[in-house]
């Protein structure tokens, strides 16, 4: 699983001209699922995101987590995080899990964040979305479960 985390002062998703979700201070989380990902990976990444110290404390150091600041999360599925551009000019998405595998894991990721106490909004799975954000910092962090866990669940 891959998550592109962006610390935001606000973010929103619009589908067909209708605002479907928005948050204030928190994180925009673009989530990609690959073949072989599982529920444990989704839960592990949600815990990682909720506890990452990416917000400044009184001294200006990144020392506070999403939970510490009472921030929200906007979770948006994005299979294109698994684009392979090594050959040719058109990206291949063969590594991305099909929708019937990806959707439950994106849902598990969002539900785990909620269970941890993070207010969560979501995009619309599979829809063409207009995603707006004000990146705070900017702080943008790439989380890849295969890299973070050495390819295993350890």
Curated annotation (Swiss-Prot):
UniProt catalytic activity: glycyl-tRNA(Ala) + H2O = tRNA(Ala) + glycine + H(+); a D-aminoacyl-tRNA + H2O = a tRNA + a D-alpha-amino acid + H(+)
GO biological process, alphabetically ordered: D-amino acid catabolic process
GO molecular function: D-tyrosyl-tRNA(Tyr) deacylase activity; Gly-tRNA(Ala) deacylase activity; Ser(Gly)-tRNA(Ala) hydrolase activity; tRNA binding
Annotated motif Gly-cisPro motif, important for rejection of L-amino acids, positions: 137-138
This enzyme's EC code(s): 3.1.1.96
UniProt keyword annotation of Ribosomal protein present: no
Keyword set includes Amino-acid biosynthesis: no
Subcellular localization(s) per the UniProt record: Cytoplasm
GO CC terms in record: cytoplasm
UniProt keyword list: Cytoplasm, Hydrolase, RNA-binding, tRNA-binding
PANTHER family: D-AMINOACYL-TRNA DEACYLASE 1, D-TYROSYL-TRNA TYR DEACYLASE
Free-text domain note: A Gly-cisPro motif from one monomer fits into the active site of the other monomer to allow specific chiral rejection of L-amino acids.
Quaternary state and interactors: Homodimer.
Similarity section: Belongs to the DTD family.
Function according to Swiss-Prot or TrEMBL: An aminoacyl-tRNA editing enzyme that deacylates mischarged D-aminoacyl-tRNAs. Also deacylates mischarged glycyl-tRNA(Ala), protecting cells against glycine mischarging by AlaRS. Acts via tRNA-based rather than protein-based catalysis; rejects L-amino acids rather than detecting D-amino acids in the active site. By recycling D-aminoacyl-tRNA to D-amino acids and free tRNA molecules, this enzyme counteracts the toxicity associated with the formation of D-aminoacyl-tRNA entities in vivo and helps enforce protein L-homochirality.
Designated name of the protein: D-aminoacyl-tRNA deacylase
Organism: Thermomicrobium roseum (strain ATCC 27502 / DSM 5159 / P-2)
């Amino acid at each position: 699983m891959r998550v592109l985390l962006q610390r935001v002062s606000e973010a929103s998703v619009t589908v067909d001209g209708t605002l479907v979700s928005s948050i204030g201070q928190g994180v925009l989380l673009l989530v990609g699922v690959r073949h072989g990902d599982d529920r444990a990976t989704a839960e592990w990444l949600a815990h990682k995101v909720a506890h990452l110290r990416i917000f400044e404390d009184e001294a200006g150091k990144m020392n506070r987590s999403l939970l510490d600041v009472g921030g929200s999360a906007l979770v948006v599925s994005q299979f294109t995080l698994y684009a392979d551009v090594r050959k040719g000019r058109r990206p291949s998405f063969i590594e991305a899990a099909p929708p019937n595998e990806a959707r439950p894991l994106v849902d598990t990721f969002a539900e785990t964040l909620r269970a941890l106490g993070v207010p969560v909004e979501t995009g619309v799975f599979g829809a063409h979305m207009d995603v707006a954000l004000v990146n705070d910092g900017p702080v943008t962090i790439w989380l890849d479960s295969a890299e973070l866990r050495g390819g295993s669940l350890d």
